[in-house]
From Swiss-Prot:
InterPro entries tied to this protein: Gemini_AL3 (IPR000657)
Function per UniProt: Increases viral DNA accumulation. Enhances infectivity and symptom expression.
UniProt protein name: Replication enhancer protein
Keywords for the protein's UniProt record, in alphabetical order: Host-virus interaction
Subunit structure: Homooligomer. Interacts with the replication-associated protein (REP). Interacts with host proliferating cell nuclear antigen (PCNA). Interacts with host retinoblastoma-related protein 1 (RBR1), and may thereby deregulate the host cell cycle. Oligomerization and interaction with PCNA are necessary for optimal replication enhancement.
Family to which this protein belongs: Belongs to the geminiviridae replication enhancer protein family.
One GO BP: rolling circle single-stranded viral DNA replication
């Protein structure tokens, strides 16, 4: 859903893409926080994927923040280590597809989190399209 207007995102908007080799560094990966709940063997990573300015311009986006909360049983990996692994898998999937769009990034995250040590993935996105 468009965060600014409240209207649902249409299929052509979600599937509108650009070739990945046309834009350098199309995505910015950021780790917001890492939680270690008491008395459990889980670790919660709060990750954010931001679209680059050139990618946003090509897709007619004003703002695109994809927020993920990844619940994992792997407590040995630090936040930076997991972020590097996550980024590598997402970019690997997108480079194999060759086209980057909102839906393909979400599919790439599903590919990256389809591992035995990941129990849950929660999504919360902030996407705004340009009016003009």
């Amino acid at each position: 859903m468009d965060s600014r207007t409240g209207e649902p995102i249409t299929v052509p908007q979600a599937e509108n893409g650009v070739y990945i080799w046309e834009i350098t560094n199309p995505l910015y990966f950021k780790i917001i926080s890492v939680e270690d709940p008491l008395y459990t063997n889980t670790r919660i990573y709060h990750l954010q994927i931001r679209f680059n300015h050139n990618l946003r311009r090509a897709l007619d986006l004003h703002k695109a923040f994809l927020n993920f909360q990844v619940w994992t049983t792997s407590t040995t990996a630090s936040g930076r280590t997991y972020l590097n692994r996550f980024k590598y898998l997402v970019m690997l999937y997108l480079e194999q597809l060759g086209v980057i769009c909102i839906n393909n990034v979400i599919r790439a995250v599903r590919f990256a989190t389809d591992r035995s040590y990941i129990t849950h993935v929660l999504e919360n996105h902030s996407i705004k399209y340009k009016f003009y």
